[in-house]
Amino acid sequence: MSSTVSAPAQIQLSQRFRGVRSRTLAICKPLTPEDMMVQSCPEASPAKWHLAHTAWFFESFILRDFLPGYRLFNEDFPWLFNSYYRSFTEFPEKRLRASFSRPGLDDILRYRSYVDEGIERLLEVNPDPEALRRIELGANHEEQHQELLLTDILHAFYTNPLRPIYRPFDSNQDMRSASAEPLRFIHFNGGLIDVGFSDSGFCYDNELPRHRVWLEPYALADRLITNREYAEFIADGGYRKSELWLSAGWDVIEQNGWRAPLYWNAEGESWTLYTLRGETSLEEAADAPVSHITYFEADAFARWAGKRLPTEFEWEAAAETQPVSGNLLDAEFLTPAPTSAASNSGDQLRQLWGDCWEWTSSAYLGYPGFAPLEGSLGEYNGKFMSGQMVLRGGSCVTPQPHIRSSYRNFFQPETRWQFSGIRLADKVTPLTGGASK
């Protein structure tokens, strides 16, 4: 065993571990066992699988390596609940996850309890610091799956003709709000800046190493684009004007017949929007941020508006000094909130955190000197650095402890089952009018 770890650090990590594991179960509480078997699109996974896979991660990368005498809960589970770690073991195709009715939900819950007990025993014996680092990684991994759970539940319920409601609004909650204020642009001077993780806590390998980049002066919209503004793009024929679209994006919308964001349904001359809180009208949600759009749709809207999407480094430079606070999972609103609910903070950007992941124009690539984790954990991020775009800022279903200014989410540009939206950017001339940072 290497150098010891302080008791307070172990206690703090134990509390964090229990909190994360409890929240995952709380997310599943409104579901029936039948709900937890559904896999409604190729990108999604059944809720039952998420419960098992997150336990598998702790068992496979922590308990097997660091808890003396640990015995697997089930010899078949390492294969059955592996996601994509090819150097670890073989695994079933993702599309087959809903095909396995066994093990049943009760067995999965027993598996989780068994793993929980193992982690707690490990924390009691003052583990190797590497074990603590992996437990923190496992907690962050599970927080990612909490978000995926909710986006997968939303899609599963949307495909059900009965349109179930995951969680109705409380009596003091709704989507109605005053009209959003006109879009304003906040100017930033750019220059030579440092980007990447700089703190002493946890981060993913794709946030490192910290390095310098050059930014020309730029401006960012003070808030996200609303449903009302996106509806204007639709009404103006945005989905019929090929000149607004990247070639691959035009192919995607034509092949799929897309003429609006996911979860929008035409009702005569208006629209309804389906959410985790149930169905609502466009009129009611007009000033909430538009969500569930692809990178291609975000890019086409920006071109239609005469603007562009920000780079990931423009976003990070603007967000680095801003405290993490907003419509995140901890707020339990579970859908992008009306823009007027975000406080008007003068020359500060609003809605940086939560509501919707913000598409950037940056391809997902390794930073100069990027080094993946050793062993099978090196497959966590690095092997996906091809054909994906970076998103920043978190969403309404991102746990608040999970997000930070250097956090890099990434998805294929045709992906839209996540809470993904738009913040516009623009170029500026140095020393022009308006706020500068």
Language-model regions: role of each:
Residues S2-R23, I27-S45, W49-G118, L132-E147, ...:
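Disulfide-stabilized, aromatic/cysteine-rich ligand-recognition loop
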Residues F91-R95, E124, R184-I186:
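A short, terminal or domain-edge coil/loop segment
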Residues L67-Y70, N74-E75, N126-L132, L246, ...:
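Short, structured coil/loop segments at alpha-helix boundaries
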Residues L122-R133, H155-P164:
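Inter-helical turn/loop segments and adjacent helix faces that build the functional surface
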Residues G138, E142-Q144, L148, D152, ...:
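Functional-site microenvironments in short loops/helix caps that host divalent-cation chemistry
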